[in-house]
């Protein structure tokens, strides 16, 4: 199983082997990768764009990642600080918790906009802050979806060998 997750080509081939179930399996994988994070989300999003085209790839990867983000937030909220601190040092989590609400909103939004930042963990850690679930949903959705759009577009460009999409 790990060899499949470690190779984009193997992952793509495995997904395609599910035939008409490929979109559902992809959706579940993308959701799970946010919550349990065995592979970077950028890899699965590129594969989604390559498999399904930029539009369907964006819809599948973005909606699955949002669901995973909300589940990770819920896990952080339900299981609390001791659980979250298993994945990051105590000081980092304490700093996040100490941010005032307006600063926390801006900080989370900025982190979600930064490509390559471990925003899956941010979703988990946000569960131990004072932010409400509703507010988290808005910030996460607005902050994360642009990145999923661009990465799905790149994945679709790879399949079409489109230099404009690849240049993005």
PLM ranges: what are they?
Residues 140-168:
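C-terminal membrane module of polytopic membrane proteins
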Residues 125-145:
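Hydrophobic alpha-helical transmembrane segments and immediately flanking/interface helices
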Residues 30-56, 115-123, 144-148:
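Transmembrane helix boundary and interhelical junction motifs in multipass membrane proteins
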Residues 33-37, 72, 111-112, 151, ...:
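Structural signal for membrane-spanning alpha-helices in multi-pass inner-membrane proteins
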Residues 1-28, 55, 61-121, 128-134, ...:
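Membrane-interfacial helix-loop-helix
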Residues 33, 64, 68, 139-143:
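Alpha-helical transmembrane segments of multi-pass membrane proteins
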Residues 45-46, 73, 124, 140, ...:
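Transmembrane alpha-helix boundary and packing residues in multipass membrane permease domains
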């Amino acid at each position: 199983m790990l060899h499949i997750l470690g190779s984009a080509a193997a992952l793509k081939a495995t997904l395609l082997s599910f035939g008409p179930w490929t979109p559902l399996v992809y959706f579940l994988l993308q959701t799970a990768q946010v919550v349990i994070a065995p592979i970077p989300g950028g890899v699965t999003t590129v594969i989604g764009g390559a498999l399904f085209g930029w539009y369907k790839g964006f819809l599948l990867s973005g909606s699955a990642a949002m669901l995973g983000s909300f589940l990770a937030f819920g896990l952080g909220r339900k299981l609390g600080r001791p659980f979250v601190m298993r994945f990051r040092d105590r000081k980092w989590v304490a700093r996040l918790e100490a941010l005032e609400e307006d600063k926390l909103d801006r900080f989370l939004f900025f982190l979600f906009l930064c490509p390559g930042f471990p925003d899956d963990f941010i979703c988990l850690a946000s569960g131990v802050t004072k932010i409400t679930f509703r507010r988290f949903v808005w910030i996460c959705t607005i902050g994360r979806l642009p990145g999923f759009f661009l990465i799905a577009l790149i994945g679709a460009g790879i399949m079409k060998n489109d230099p404009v999409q690849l240049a993005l």
